Design a protein with these regions (language model features):
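Mature catalytic core of soluble alpha/beta enzymes
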Residues: 4-8, 14-275
């Protein structure tokens, strides 16, 4: 994660998976005319639906089975990180309050807890009960009243998550979701896998995350367009090489309540309501 290049449209406090139409997906489409003019390594294009997100890939070079290996790795990561797939390690943690993880995922938990600390709890991976109560995990949206929100906030505190070796433990009323960091982690893992498989250049979108591998095949930087939050236009863009560009905003995943107010999926762990 140390190579990430962050471009923030809205303060990322905590959220669930991005919708299938994202600013980053649009950015990939916007860059495709440039990519089509490139020659050299063979181009591979494919799409994967996983983690509640449409993932789009453009890869140059690499072994013949690189697509198969990318798909397999995504499935492996989703099987571990999913909070809704019965029997997954994350599902087991939330149900049993104690779970033994593979070392790489125990380390991811530690890295996530460090992010929680660094943001003074603005990002809190234990805020899943809040996200769930508002219906963003099921699509059955509702507005919890003030009393319920207070009760939900009392269940949120990343400092109560214990990691001992590869074993993670939480309090009886807690639930954890790594959705706020999961796609960024997945992008990093996939980028490393592609390099191991001989990929010389790649651009791929995982919902709110765009990852680049190397430079474009002509040696120039990738240019990623950043869409305006509430308008069908681009604010500008960034030039990157071998980095990720990550955005999060409430303009893609939200609902309008009976009160006429718009409520988005980015939650404030301190209030139990959208940020």
């Amino acid at each position: 994660m140390k190579k990430w290049c962050l471009v923030i449209l809205a303060l990322m406090l905590c959220g669930c998976s991005a919708s299938t139409k994202t600013a980053e997906t649009e950015a990939v489409k916007n860059d495709r005319p440039v990519l089509r003019t490139e020659t050299g390594s063979e181009e591979k294009n494919f799409t994967v639906f996983a983690m509640d997100t449409v993932m789009q890939f453009q890869i140059y070079g690499g072994n013949d089975d690189v697509e198969e290996k990318v798909r397999g790795k995504i499935e492996e990561l989703e099987d571990t990180l999913s909070v809704t797939k019965e029997g997954s390690p994350m599902w087991n943690l939330n149900e049993k309050k104690n779970e033994n993880f593979a070392e790489e995922f125990a380390n991811l938990m530690l890295q996530s807890l460090k992010l929680c600390k660094d943001t003074d709890g603005a990002l809190d991976i234990s805020a899943y009960p809040i996200v769930k109560a508002w219906g963003f995990t099921t699509g059955e949206h509702r507005i919890p009243d003030e009393e319920e929100r207070k009760a939900l906030v009392s269940r949120v505190d990343y400092r109560k998550i214990q990691v001992n070796g590869n074993t993670v433990s939480i309090e009886p009323d807690m639930m954890v979701d790594l959705g706020s960091v999961g796609k960024g982690y997945t992008a990093e893992v996939l980028a490393n896998l592609m390099k191991e498989e001989g990929v010389t250049s790649a651009l791929f979108s995982l919902g709110g995350n765009i990852q680049t591998v190397g430079t474009k095949s002509d040696g120039s930087d990738w240019f990623i367009g950043i869409r305006a939050a509430e308008e069908d236009r681009y604010l500008g863009g960034v030039s990157v090489t071998d980095k990720a560009v990550v955005t999060s905003g409430g303009y893609e995943r939200y609902f309008t309540g009976d009160d006429g107010q718009v409520y988005w999926h980015i939650m404030d762990p301190k209030t139990g309501a959208p940020a």
